[in-house]
């Protein structure tokens, strides 16, 4: 019975993904195209290929191009135009592969920098490693022609270099550059909801150290709208925590201690069970922040007793 329920849940989840995300829709189209191809229904397969091609190029979902290519290439009509059509498709394939390679390079580099930041954040850095990243060719500013995903990863990587140097303002500006890429390209948001929500949450965190709260209400609103549409509960809870945390800092900066206490009590009520279950260090931090809020409101001894 449990297995049956699990399978039904998985099917419902897959249907939801197909109906509600661009990537889910594209995956479904390509799966249907593969089925039609395998059964020799070439005309129907070509219709699906056309639909998939439109989504791939409209939303820069080049990860899916390889599958499209191997469906499309065998279906090129064997007539007098075959050679030209085959050459055009091969040229396109090489161009997309080149873009995917660029994205992969930025992805790998951004992961290396993130790990470097996490490993050395509380210790002494190896100067050679840090200089290697700072001088890396991929982190020079001539990136205008690369795909949006690579541009996003470019700024993501630089953010952690500036965080490592404790240059909070530059880290804020790099995260702001990431957000601009999304806000200028609505379709990029639709195809990359996870990255968009992460970026908005990170913007709230980046505000804290340079104390740049001028865009707080704007970012908070954008994040709340995005969270209503997104179904990853763990991510949504984490980003709601970022909203509470930024509101708490903003309230303390404005000497609005009662508001700060209210924000932290709301956060505690919302996140206590989740943090106890998944992230005890975040739970301890939250209790500490709650204690500070009580202290500022002259309620510390009463609440801690």
Show where each model-derived region lies:
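Helix-coil-helix junctions within alpha-helical repeat/solenoid scaffolds
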Residues: 252-305
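TPR-repeat structural position
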Residues: 42-43, 62, 82, 168-169, ...
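Acidic, glycine-rich loop-and-beta core segments that form the ion-binding/anion-interacting portion
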Residues: 198, 202-206, 210-232, 236-268
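Alpha-solenoid helical repeat architecture
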Residues: 60-67, 101-108, 145-153, 186-200, ...
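Amphipathic alpha-helical segments of tetratricopeptide repeats
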Residues: 49-57, 90-98, 133-143, 175-188, ...
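Internal metal/ion-chelating core segments
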Residues: 105-230
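Tandem amphipathic alpha-helical repeat scaffolds
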Residues: 29-38, 70-79, 108-124, 152-167, ...
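Flexible inter-repeat linkers and adjacent short helices
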Residues: 1-133, 143-145
């Amino acid at each position: 019975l449990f297995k049956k329920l699990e399978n039904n849940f998985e099917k419902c989840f897959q249907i939801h993904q197909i109906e509600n995300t661009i990537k889910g829709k594209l995956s479904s189209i390509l799966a249907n195209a593969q089925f039609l191809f395998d059964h020799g229904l070439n005309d129907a397969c070509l219709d699906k290929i056309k639909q998939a091609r439109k989504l791939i190029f409209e939303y820069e979902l080049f990860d899916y191009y390889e599958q499209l290519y191997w469906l499309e290439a065998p279906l090129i009509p064997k007539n007098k135009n075959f050679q030209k059509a085959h050459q055009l498709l091969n040229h396109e394939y090489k161009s997309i592969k080149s873009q995917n390679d660029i994205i992969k390079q930025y992805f790998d580099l951004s992961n290396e920098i993130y790990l470097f930041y996490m490993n050395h954040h509380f210790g002494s850095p190896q100067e050679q490693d840090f200089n290697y990243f700072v001088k890396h060719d991929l982190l020079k500013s001539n990136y205008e022609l690369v795909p949006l995903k690579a541009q996003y990863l470019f700024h993501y990587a630089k953010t952690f270099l500036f965080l490592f140097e404790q240059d909070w303002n530059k880290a804020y500006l790099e995260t702001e550059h990431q957000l601009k890429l999304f806000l200028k390209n609505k379709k990029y948001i639709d195809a990359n909801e996870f990255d968009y929500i992460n970026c908005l949450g990170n913007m709230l965190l980046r505000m804290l150290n340079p104390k740049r709260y001028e865009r707080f209400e704007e970012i908070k609103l954008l994040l709340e709208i995005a969270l209503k549409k997104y179904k990853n509960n763990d991510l949504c809870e984490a980003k709601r925590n970022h909203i509470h945390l930024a509101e708490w800092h903003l309230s303390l900066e404005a000497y609005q201690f009662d508001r700060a206490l209210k924000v932290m009590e709301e956060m505690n009520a919302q996140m206590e069970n989740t943090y106890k279950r998944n992230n005890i260090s975040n739970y301890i931090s939250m209790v500490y922040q709650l204690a500070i809020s009580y202290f500022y409101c002259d309620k510390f001894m009463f609440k801690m007793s």
